[in-house]
Amino acid sequence: MSGLYMMATISDRNQARRFLDFYREYGLSVTLLTYGRGTAASEILDAFGLEAAEKAVIFSVVTGEEWKRLKTGLERQIKIDIPGSGIAFIVPVSSIGGKKQFEFLTDGRGFVKGEESTLKDTKYELLVVIANQGYTELVMDAARAAHAPGGTVIHAKGTGAEKAEKFFGVSLAKEKEVIFMVTRKEGKMPS
């Protein structure tokens, strides 16, 4: 497994420091940390007397070999394979916007870009939905109807709305919600 990947880790917010320390221990110095919230249905939360979970979302760029090492460490040290301890996954990176950006993201690890290859069979896929603020529950209702287990929401601001507004002739909301869901491949609708 070679290549460059965007690694995402989603955990409870109070576990962020633990993951960041773990990644630093494994030599990853360039990470992006942001916060989101879980999307468990309110009736499930009410039944267990829980509140909506605040989530930490950590992004980093890793090589295929680094991912193998990290995955083993995550399972052995963090016990990430136990439900409720977080989730980590990778997405292939097909391009990076310039030499300086590439060097920054690979942090001098000596990665040499090889030939591009097609995506191999995977059991899971990352579904990313960008919706106007306030529509997350509508998105999650549809996802749950298709048996998606849940997701993580990050509040964001849309950019480039001026061009889209000119094209559509209506004003567009700038406040967005980015919803990440990891789903089994067989549960994904065909495109």
Description of each model-found segment:
Residues 1-191:
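Positively charged, small/polar-rich N-terminal and surface patches that mediate targeting and assembly
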